[in-house]
Amino acid sequence: MAHLSDVVVMEVSNTVFKHRHATRNTLARNRMLARLTEAAELGVLLVTHDNAELMWLRRHVGTDDIAEPEPYLFCLQHDWDALTPTERALRTIKGLAEFHPDWAFWGYDAALLWGLEVPNDLLGPRFLVKTGCSVTLSSGCRLLRPQMAGALERVDGVRVTPFWRTVEDCLLRAPFSYGL
């Protein structure tokens, strides 16, 4: 049993709590900026499945030079701004493939991964093979049935349609002048 005389009441200034909170925020900020910088040096987008990281990053999008080009994919804004549309598309595709390992790509997305030239104005919504993944049509993706895709291959760790199937898909969908 504790007696009232055993309890010591101390007054602690509010600045101690503010300092601890600020230190914790600075450590989190430095850690996330270091991860974003490392991802930029590797030429990829930062992909996170961690809810705490995701919440921190989303709170700082638009500030701290952080961008979220696609859901769950992050980078430093100045690095993103310096990329060409082709580089942006490639990083986005690779990031989506890392976040969704069951996804496979076709059309212009697969062409980029195969190293084919794709005009900037043909880059846009993602081209996904419907592989049992839960992609909604509202996400702007163009879906292809698996039986139409044929056997899938891996290029740079990303599942894509075979090379000649990719060429055929692109030629069938591109304006005539691009097909030449």
Listing of model-derived features with the role each one plays in the protein:
Residues 2-180:
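Short gly/ser-rich loop at a beta-strand->alpha-helix junction or flexible surface loop bordering the NTP-binding
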